[in-house]
Amino acid sequence: MNKQNKKIIYIGDNRSLYTKYQCTSAPSVIFIAGLGDSFEIWKKVQDRISDVTSTLSYTRVGIGSSSVTAVPQTCHDLVEELSELLQELDVKKPYILVGHSFGGLIARLSASLNPLDICGMILVDAAPEFKELAYEQVLPENLVAGNREYLENPSLNSENIDKMQSYKQIVDHSRQTDLPLTIIARGLPDSGEEGWPSQKILEIEQNLQAEFKKLSTSSKFRIASHSGHYIHHDEPEIVIEEIILMLKEIEKALN
């Protein structure tokens, strides 16, 4: 296979997922995008990592060329979707999961539910559970109601995700492991609607992401100083570097 091996894969209930799969060796690096993003968001990083090991990126149900769903989904549903896809493609185990934004929640829950299949995890400006509630500490009063509605109403996000239920699933299955874990947080504030306290929100998110270190006894935290939320676009070399470092560490541990 080559780097341009893009195809639609059908999983249970005839759902279709648009994928980009490069099969070479194990471990396989699995890229999990944030809400509303297709697999193309990983292009710069995936193409480089495909030179050294197997990689898979995919577009979830409800986005782009993948199937559409009208039913609210939870993080657990998306973990099952990924598991079915990995099985259908017979992707080589074990896996390093690389999750961006909401994709970080999918990676975390997948690692909790399938610990024997996962050998490492990299969180790229990953969404902390219940982050919207933390925002309320610094939001002006006129933005609190809209922020809470976005948290509680699945129809307001791009994939019809039940965030409240998803966050509860993360909390219920959270436990400390010794899984190699790298956390990369953005260093620049993102622009929001008028009155949005971008710098204060950045500080909250960096602090919450630093707490991810407690998820593993083998964790590291890094800030991408020149990146906004899309670190894999702004500074792809950082994500590439951390994946390659983890691959080397895993190889060393196995030998």
PLM region descriptions:
Residues 122-159, 192, 196:
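Flexible "cap/lid" loop of the alpha/beta hydrolase fold
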Residues 1-16:
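N-terminal cap/lid segment of alpha/beta-hydrolase-fold proteins
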Residues 32, 58-60, 124, 185, ...:
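Alpha/beta-hydrolase
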